[in-house]
Each structure stands twice: as C-alpha cells, then as structure tokens.
C-alpha cells in the first residue's frame, strides 16, 4: 500500500469514527493555495478542522509529524473556509488531530485529539 493509499484509508476510517459520534462531514480534502484540510466536520456549534496522520506502527507516533508550519497552513485554510461557509462565525472553530496507526495494511488504532492545536503563536512562523 502506498503512503497516499494509506492516507486515504485513514481519512475514510476517521470519517466513519466521526459519523459514529454524531458529527456531520461537511468537506473532505478542502484545498486552497498553500494549504489543505483533511476533514471538516460539524457537531452542534463546533466546526472541527481535522488533520489526519497515518503511519505504520514501526514509523513512530503519527502526530510527531504535525509541524508548526503545517498547523499554520491548516489555520489559514480554515479562515478561508469560514469566510466562505461560516461568515457570521456562528460555529466555533476547533483544530483536531488524529493519529491513525496501521500495521500490514490494517488500521491498528485511531487516537482522536480534540483541540490539538490553536492559532496562538503561529503568526511567528514563516
């Protein structure tokens, strides 16, 4: 399985995970110039911008690969999404991250972290 196939499989599993917990999936793979959000999901008044990191068990913990630069790109993409889809800010944005661990092509675990990061301090990153 290629890394992109593993990533898609991980994202699909996370969508199922979110649906089982009462979320509505609003968008997958939302792209703007310079950024992408894997999953945008809503539950009540929360609009979750979800970054999915899939790795084989032998490659270490997936969220170790979520850099401050990537967080900044996600925040920028979320601001553009909100400007278009949530202009009155009726929904509260939240930045979540998910670690999907695989072994031999099978998903071993999903660790969902709400409020994994926020925009504070990211403006200093270039």
Question: What are these regions, as identified by a protein language model?
Answer:
Residues 38-41, 99-101:
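Conserved protein-kinase catalytic-loop segment immediately C-terminal to the catalytic Asp
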Residues 86-126:
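Domain-level recognition of nuclease-like catalytic cores that cleave nucleotide substrates
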Residues 1-28:
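Acidic-basic catalytic patches of nuclease active cores, encompassing PD-(D/E)XK
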Residues 32-35, 106:
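Short acidic/glycine-enriched loop/turn segments that link adjacent beta-strands
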Residues 54-103:
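Catalytic cores of nucleic-acid endonucleases
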Residues 1, 5, 9, 34, ...:
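Residues at secondary-structure transition points
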Residues 18, 39-58, 74:
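Conserved catalytic cores of phosphodiester-cleaving nucleases, focusing on short active-site segments
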């Amino acid at each position: 399985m290629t890394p992109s196939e593993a990533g898609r499989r991980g994202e699909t599993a996370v969508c199922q995970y979110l649906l089982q917990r009462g979320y509505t999936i609003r968008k997958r793979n939302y792209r703007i110039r310079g950024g992408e959000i894997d999953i945008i999901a809503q539950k009540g008044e929360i609009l979750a911008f979800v970054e999915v990191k899939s790795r084989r068990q032998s490659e270490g913990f997936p969220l170790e690969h979520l850099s401050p630069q990537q967080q900044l790109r996600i925040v920028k993409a979320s601001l553009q999404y909100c400007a278009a889809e949530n202009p009155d800010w009726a929904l509260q944005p939240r930045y979540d991250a998910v670690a999907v661990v695989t072994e031999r092509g099978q998903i071993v675990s999903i660790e969902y972290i709400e409020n994994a990061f926020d925009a504070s301090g990211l403006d200093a990153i270039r």
